[in-house]
Amino acid sequence: MAWPLLAPALLDWLSKPGAPDPPAWAQDLQGLAGEQPLPWWAAGFYQGQARHHLLRLRDNPRPAGLAPWIEGLLPQLEANLASRHRPGLVVPVPSWKRRANPLPALLAAALCRRLGWRLQPQLLRRSRPVLGQHHLGRELRMANQRGAFQAVAAPRGQLGPRPVVLLVDDILTTGATACAAAEALQQQHWRVVGLACLARTPARGRAGRDLTSDSRISDGPG
C-alpha cells in the first residue's frame, strides 16, 4: 500500500487518547543524538528486539507499531531542533525501488503533525539507482550514493529567511545516504539542519559489530 494512503491513518491514530502501553523493548528508545557525519537524531539503537520490530514494521507498517519510535524521537527533536528554528520543511529520503520502504515517508508525516513543520517530499528525488549496500563498508557506501540524488532549486527572491530542511530516514548507519541527500539539497541552496531517523546502527564495540548491517535487503542502511 502506498504511503499517502497509510499516512492519514497514522496521524489519526496518533491524535487519539488511550493508546496502548508500549512493549517492553520500547523502554530502550530513550532518544539519541550526534553530530557526525551530519547532525542526527534517533529514537534508539538498531539492535535486539527493536531491530526485529523495525524489520516487521517495514513489511507491515502499522500506526500502532510506529508510535513508540516517534515518542522516543520527539524529545530529542524538540530540545535540539524545533526550539532553535522556525517551522521548516521535512523531506523523507526517497528510495529508487519501485516498492519503496514506507517508513521514511510515514515518519516524516508523523513528525510534521507533531512539530508543525511542512512535508515536502517533492524537493528530493533519486537521479540513478544504487547498489544494495548492506555488505558495503563506509567508503564504498559513500561512493555508491555519490550523485544519487537530485533536488529542486530553492526559490530565489523570496521575502524573509528560507525555511530549513530536515531529512528523514528509517535507519542511520554510516551516513552515506543522508550525506548524499543533504549535498544535493545544499547544491540547490537549501539549508539542511540534519537527519531524523528511527534507529542508529551501533558502532563497533556495541553488540560486537561495526557500522554495516545485513537487514535492509532492498536499499541497505545508509
Predicted regions and their residues:
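Glycine-rich phosphate/pyrophosphate-handling loop used in enzymes and phosphotransfer proteins
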Residues: 1-222
